């Protein structure tokens, strides 16, 4: 059974390539050792989605029409998700593993990850309760996911009686942020909420710290993970927080088992583990579980059956012993140099 992994291998999101591909290889090795998917050995095909719809569709067409893959796991930005689903979703299963907006998706897309509202609400409640934060400035990239994250933030801040002090949407290119940083400094915000992708988050946070703002206000960042923090550097992560359903330092038996498999496979020089890679690992196991559930390895049949309303619940149930688990917890982590230390679960703040 040939499974494709479609994700950006360059550009702002390319920094996750090593961890995504390493985690996928661990998942495939684990499944093949247990008999593959219903007796069929799995082989992986890696494909570059690029960062625009044209490149993503060209890659998707090649995967299905030329490579003849039986399923596609997407770990790319959300603006590519619906076009890819529309192009291939009726022919092969399409599983999307990136954190996403929580909006209604195409019927042919099975999304497994947690959503922005699921993360933002407990995080904002915690920031309000524990840090007395009521004034927020938002910075995101200029495409679907950050704009929907900003919409969720505005709604949630309004519900808790807080205030949005300003916002900015940045292109996914390297840029100087002097004017924006002056706006943030003058805004009176307690917290800068970020929805920046990969290298964009690295660049912004380095400049934020260089301007001395890291000593004056908190930063709460979506999808700032172990990879991004390493890129930002130890001198620029003061007062930087993130929340996610997965951090490598979350101490659970499920995660300990995964980390053992991962480091046994790649040793001390393994790419850092992060949610991006773990999502793909779980996507592979979800596909295998649904193939068993529906008693089929036929791509079109699986794609049709996975459109059912119970597929996501069945997939997450099958992941009960995997790192994130059946019912994802939401963890808060604080940067300590170039690591993220999990401080607590914040589900209770929902």
Give the positions of each predicted feature.
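Periplasmic-binding protein-like
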Residues: 63-76, 95-97, 137-138, 188-204, ...
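Extracytoplasmic "Venus flytrap"
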Residues: 4-25, 49, 271-277
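Extracellular/periplasmic periplasmic-binding protein-like sensory domains
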Residues: 208-279
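Signal peptide-proximal N-terminal region
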Residues: 23-44
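Segments of small-molecule ligand-sensing domains
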Residues: 265-277, 288-342
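Short beta-strand segments enriched in small/hydrophobic residues
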Residues: 1-19, 75-76, 133-140
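Extracytoplasmic ligand/sensor domains, especially the bilobed periplasmic-binding protein
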Residues: 69-164, 216-221, 227-234
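Short, well-structured alpha-helical segments in soluble
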Residues: 46, 50-70, 126, 175-188
